Every structure is written in structure tokens, then in C-alpha cells.
Amino acid sequence: MYLLAMRIIQDCRKRNTLKKIKDYYFHKAKSDGYVARSVYKLEEIDKKHSLLNRGDHVLDLGCSPGAWLQYTAEKVGEKGQVLGVDLQGVKLSLPKNFKVLQADIFDMKVQDLEINGSMIDVILSDMAPKTTGIRDADARRSFALNQKVLELSVSLLRSQGALLVKAFQGEPIEQLRREFSNSFAQVKLCKPKSSRSESVEIFLLGLNKK
């Protein structure tokens, strides 16, 4: 009985801690002027791996509601160019060197995703499949989605370019990692602090496209 009570107390403490973390990043995003807390995931990965630079050409897939676009604007500056694509619209005032298309990325031609007819430096994908609640099934759906993004990156990224995708933890992640290794000199698995610890989401980063 004592052990059961202790487990319940520990579970409650854990839930309260996770709620505080979630609330912290939610309120921080509002305070910092970002439309979503997901911006801090990209910021952490960028700071650790020097992903985004001034003047970069960036493709942001699954860009709505626009937090990653906001952060990217700060990083690439006026000389950079950014194209965002999402099934949903983005209700943000963005710099003139930014363009957002409301479309299905996989219905578009490769040339439609080029920026001013040139190759891309960085592809960001915060896309996720429709989930079922069944962990293995969701991991497989995420794997299939990211395979398509990886195929696109082969055609769109310049040599030494980078690809960041959101994935779900599970057996297929290692296969996806191996497939990334065929196209990138370095492959990293990233679990940002702002990503809830109980979440199965993880980010896969390919650096220095071969």
C-alpha cells in the first residue's frame, strides 16, 4: 500500500514538472513574440550545430503557424531567401525575402521548390503524419513521410547543405538514420530540452550533403 501511494505521488510530481516545463516555453514564446513554443527546438539545434547562417536559402516544410519562419528570418537576414510550404496558411507579417505557399509539398514539382532557380542551403521539416495513437504504426508513418523529404533533399540541396526533420522514436528511426548516412557526411539525433520528455518526437539532422 505504501509503495502504491509513493508511486502515485511520484507520478503526480512528474506530471506537475512536465506541465511547468510546457507552460514555461509556452509563456516564453508569447513573451519573445513567437507564435509557437516549437521555435525553441529549432533554436537549440541551430545553436549547437550552426545550422542557419546569414544569406542562406532555406526551405521550411510544414511551416505553419510560422515560429520557425520567424526564427529563420532573424538568422538569414535580408540577403537570405526563405520559402515556406504548408497545407495550412500562415498569418504572419514576414520580410519581403520570404514566400509562403499553401500547398501539399508532395504535389509540387522540384523546380517549384527552388528559390530563385538556385539550390537550397538548408531544408527544415517540422511535418508529422496523422497519428493513430499506436506507437509502432505512428513511427512507420513518420518514417515513410521522412523518406519522401529525404528524396526531395537529394534534388534540392546544394553540396554541403543540411536537412533537419522531425521523426518519431521507434524501430524505423535507425533505418532512416542509415538512409541519411548515404546522403550526408554527418548524421545527428537531437532531442531538444523544450521537447517534452514523454514525447516520442525526435529530430534527425543531416549535415554536409555529399
Outline where the language-model segments fall.
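Class I S-adenosyl-L-methionine
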Residues: E171-K210
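S-adenosyl-L-methionine
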Residues: V90-G117
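Conserved SAM-binding loop of SAM-dependent methyltransferases across substrates and taxa
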Residues: P65-V76
